UniProtKB/Swiss-Prot annotation:
Protein's recorded name: Microtubule-associated tumor suppressor 1 homolog
Main location: mitochondrion
Recorded GO CC terms: cytoplasm; Golgi apparatus; mitochondrion; nucleus; plasma membrane
Coiled-coil residue windows: 106-401
Tissue spec. comment: Present in neurons (at protein level).
Domain of life from the UniProt record: Eukaryota
Organism field: Rattus norvegicus (Rat)
Keyword set includes Transmembrane: no
Family stated for the protein in its record: Belongs to the MTUS1 family.
Amino acid sequence: MLLSPKFSLSTIHVRLTAKGLLRNLRLPSGLRKNTVIFHTVEKGRQKNPRSLCIQTQTAPDVLSTERTLELADYKTKCENQSGFILHLKQLLSCGNTKFEALTVVIQHLLSEREEALKQHKTLSQELVSLRGELVAASSTCEKLEKARNDLQTAYEGFVQKLNQQHQTDQTELENRLKEFYTAECEKLQSIYIEEAEKYKTQLQEQFDNLNAAHETTKLEIEASHSEKVELLKKTYETSLSEIKKSHEMEKKLLENLLNEKQESLEKQINDLKSENDALNERLKSEEQKQLSREKANSKNPQVMYLEQELESLKAVLEIKNEKLHQQDLKLMKMEKLVDNNTTLVDKLTRFQQENEELKARMDRHMAISRQLSTEQAALQESLEKESKVNKRLSMENEELLWKLHNGDLCSPKRSPTSSAIPFQSPRNSGSFSSPSISPR
């Protein structure tokens, strides 16, 4: 164990101040020399005080100057030493704080070690107790296994006894159920015969009512269907006749317009051809005039040349004027044709729309007629189905009557599978009272 912290710190502080710090200090070279000189000067003063007094008497002036210099040196040395001493004090304080921190850390580690030892002791005690508990638990487990084996043997014997009792009870219950089932079958057979007679009468009444209602509805549907078909035929014929008339009128109008336009275009073509022939004749006459002039003026070449140029210029001007006039006429005609074409295109679009509307009406009338034909076919099929159902019901009624008269339902010699059917007859009695009725 360590000593107390106060005693250890004081002893360590003394040792550091006495030995360690002064040896380990790294002072600069100038300071060490000054300290040595200071110590030697002090020793010389102590040893030779008389020599100093004699020297002071002989040379006072020199001493005064030397003393002033020495005093200045001593002051500088003292200041340096005071700074050095302060630095040493700071180092001592830092070392003391570090050492105190080390002591605190060591004390903390010692306390943790003591706590770890205490925990080790407690854990060892717990291990000992757990070993004892393990031994006790193993002994109890062995005892419980023995008890389980004993209980298993007892349980097997009890189960065997229960199986034997269950088999005996099962045989007794089977015998009782057989007796009860035979008695109930006899009762249910009698009840079934009574209910069959009741349902027979009900079925006959329902069958008669259905036949009457079916005949009335059939007549009504046929009458309404024939009336609808006649009305649709009349409307269809009238609409067809009107559409055909309007279509023929429009067709005639369009044909007349086309013929008129063709005639006008042919007239325009003939006029243009006549104009072209007149222009060709003019050109031929002018050429002949030019030839005659050339023959007459062949003696003067300059005059001939000038006249030829004038005539050529005149011909060119006339040709250009005629071309311009023709182009103006063509433009006027083209504008008229464009206007006529636009009007005709508008009329054609309008007539096409009307034709499309008429076609749509025709398609609608055709669809309505097809619907009516399909409805008529469906009604005929439903009537045929109802007639088949009525026939089937009549056949079933006849079979039931035949069975009742022959006594098939009252036969005592029947298998157990067949006897299960009358057992469910009161619950399923609705099957007789709800025959297949068509929605019509």
